[in-house]
């Protein structure tokens, strides 16, 4: 949801601006627009990642745990949500960085990075799955074969979510490296202060959600309306704490406006 509503939309919005600056050979304008896009993405995506990771089980239970969708199925699905959410910043930042290539009519570089990420994803899948099997599966169970092990031992699919996240970070690193090598973008000043304040705001929100989860009931055993009520309280409370922390740390609405 955060990626579709914000990440992709932001990349679409800044593409014509970056293209205009590139055509006008306005390096400063190109740099400021892309820099704004990166900061705006992080302001939204980091708390979304943290919220999805901490509230994975409450979210899955509230939406899906009805009928034959059991509590155990909710827990296993939450593992996938947790793993994939870890890669959300990379997914979103890739969508923000890609227009910097498309604006310069460079479609080859994103394809190269995407292919490398796809190959890495397959390698990460195998490596992480093997690691989890070595850590979680008893020796006697491994003798039954790979497919039997996957069917009998719950939670091994967690490796697939983490592998997707790691391959997305690799995609981002490659794109960033090649963008810097192209020498068309200057990182704007103030990033250290920006990141410190942003991390502190996310820390405040994360602590608020953690304390809220200690008070909240087990989402897999309560009824539908209690799940909805508690999830709404946790999401609303976390968002409120994040907004207040951002204001206290000096963030203002103008930080969301394109320069």
Tell what function each PLM region has.
Residues 1-259:
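Membrane-embedded alpha-helical bundles of multi-pass transporters/translocases
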């Amino acid at each position: 949801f955060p990626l579709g509503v914000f990440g992709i939309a932001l990349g679409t919005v800044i593409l014509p601006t970056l293209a205009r600056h590139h055509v006008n050979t306005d390096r400063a304008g190109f740099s400021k627009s892309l820099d704004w896009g990166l900061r705006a993405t992080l302001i939204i995506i980091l708390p979304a990642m943290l919220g999805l990771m901490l509230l994975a089980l409450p979210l899955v239970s509230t939406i899906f745990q009805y009928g034959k969708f059991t509590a155990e199925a909710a827990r296993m699905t939450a593992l996938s949500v947790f793993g994939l959410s870890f890669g959300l910043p990379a997914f979103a930042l890739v969508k923000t960085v890609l227009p910097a290539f498309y604006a310069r009519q460079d479609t080859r570089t994103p394809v190269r990075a995407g292919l490398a990420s796809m190959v890495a994803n397959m390698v990460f899948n195998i490596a992480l799955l093997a690691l989890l099997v070595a850590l979680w599966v008893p020796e006697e169970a491994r003798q039954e074969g790979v497919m039997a092990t996957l069917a009998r031992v719950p939670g091994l699919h967690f490796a697939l979510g983490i592998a997707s996240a790691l391959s997305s970070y690799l995609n981002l690193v490659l794109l960033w490296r090649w963008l810097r090598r192209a020498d068309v973008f200057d990182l704007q000043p103030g990033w250290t202060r920006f990141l410190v304040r942003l991390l502190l705001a996310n820390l405040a929100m994360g602590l608020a959600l953690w304390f809220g989860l200690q008070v909240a009931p087990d989402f897999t055993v309560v009824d539908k309306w209690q799940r909805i009520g508690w999830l709404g309280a946790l999401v609303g409370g976390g968002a409120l704490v994040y907004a207040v922390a951002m204001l206290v740390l000096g963030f203002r609405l103008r930080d969301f406006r394109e320069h």
